[in-house]
Amino acid sequence: MKKLIGNDWDEVLAPAFESEKYQELRDFLKEEYQTKQIFPDMYHIFTAFKLTSFADTKVVILGQDPYHNPGQATGMSFSVNPGVPLPPSLKNIYKELYDDVGAVPVNHGYLKKWADQGVLLLNAVLTVPYGNANGHRGKGWELITDTAIKALSDRGKVVFILWGKFAQNKIPLIDEGKNVIIKSPHPSPFSADRGFFGSRPFSRCNDALIKFGESPIDWQLPQEVNPADMA
């Protein structure tokens, strides 16, 4: 079978990629990309998996689906391309990041430095039509991403950061005896004041990694993004 990702995720996800459900998803997406504006572009659908291999994944920050306006979606949850205004949820993430670990806010939203350190920035649904949040929900991506979450859980020593009810619906896939779950309300302006602010997910994540015998994440993002370092 053609390697879709190019690292150990291909083997981990092979049963899902070889399923009839995934073939139906591929046929659906082919039509969607030909007739609509879909984000991210097809070359960045699997960016999260490409940047953070199965073996290297220490942390999962789970999002719902990609940003649905032009230029935003990167293939990484919560991340936007350099030069794109920060979405409100990401602004709140940066505020909590500063309050929690003192990471200085940056004027871009490109989170690849986290991915390079073992933070899988995974959306549960990997594509979205322009202007239509959740437009591809239930079309088949959940088979792929649920398989990934379950495989990481079975391997163990992973910190799952789950913001909001949608992400927390994945808790039944996770073995809490082998892994750590950090949960709070979503960083969206609609819910951040209800317990996201002050939840200290970044320091709690690093505390858990150290207990697992893993190196902590350096959450400080670079002030500037080198174009050569973009995925």
UniProtKB/Swiss-Prot annotation:
Disulfides per UniProt: none
Pfam families found in the cross-reference section: UDG (PF03167)
Keyword set includes DNA repair: yes
Keywords: Cytoplasm, DNA damage, DNA repair, Hydrolase
Class of this enzyme: hydrolase
Source superkingdom: Bacteria
GO BP, sorted A to Z: base-excision repair, AP site formation via deaminated base removal
Subcellular localization: Cytoplasm
SUPFAM superfamilies: Uracil-DNA glycosylase-like
GO cellular component, one term: cytoplasm
UniProt main location, coarse: cytoplasm
Function: Excises uracil residues from the DNA which can arise as a result of misincorporation of dUMP residues by DNA polymerase or due to deamination of cytosine.
Record family assignment: Belongs to the uracil-DNA glycosylase (UDG) superfamily. UNG family.
The protein's name in its UniProt record: Uracil-DNA glycosylase
Species name: Lactobacillus johnsonii (strain CNCM I-12250 / La1 / NCC 533)
